Amino acid sequence: MSNPVKGRHQARKRAVDLLFEAEARDLSPLEIIEVRSALAKSKLDVAPLHPYTVVVAQGVSEHTARIDELIISHLQGWKLDRLPAVDRAILRVSIWELLYADDVPEPVAVDEAVELAKELSTDDSPGFVNGLLGKVMLVTPQIRAAAQAVQQAVRMAAGTSEDHVPQREPAAGQLGQDDSNGGQVAAVCR
């Protein structure tokens, strides 16, 4: 039986690799996913991407501008393009999880990012990643609340009279794969 926590960790690591590769090759993450998927279909010895890797890479690709804006707003004495490329990829994955992954508790997203920084980057990176993500975590509730308000306003303008904002549907590979609460999906609106 496979360990879902280790599976998610490896999927995150592969998402970081994929984002790093996309940036290095000046391609979009979606193009890399497409190439990897085609390769896995055509060659028996090439494993397909983990579904969570695809979900994360697609999510980061869709929200890169907002994610990078958050990173930039919390950098002190640094510019985004001066960060090590692997640190940018790690931060993008983690911030995507903080903002958009309903089934990943915030402390898990940060801890995973720090672990990836220990595995993949410089000696200074884990502390840097932890510090920056700690600052981002302070504003994520406001960001999620603002997103909910916008969604509710759109619904009201469309004539829907619901009093609550439904959670977004978990993307493929997300449902039931929580890292910390026995596989149950967190009931936090994000």
Swiss-Prot record:
UniProt region (Disordered), positions on chain: 158-190
Superkingdom in the source lineage: Bacteria
GO molecular function terms listed in the Swiss-Prot or TrEMBL record: RNA binding
Record function comment: Involved in transcription antitermination. Required for transcription of ribosomal RNA (rRNA) genes. Binds specifically to the boxA antiterminator sequence of the ribosomal RNA (rrn) operons.
GO cellular component, one term: cytosol
Family: Belongs to the NusB family.
Key words of the record: RNA-binding, Transcription, Transcription antitermination, Transcription regulation
GO biological process: DNA-templated transcription termination; transcription antitermination
Protein name: Transcription antitermination protein NusB
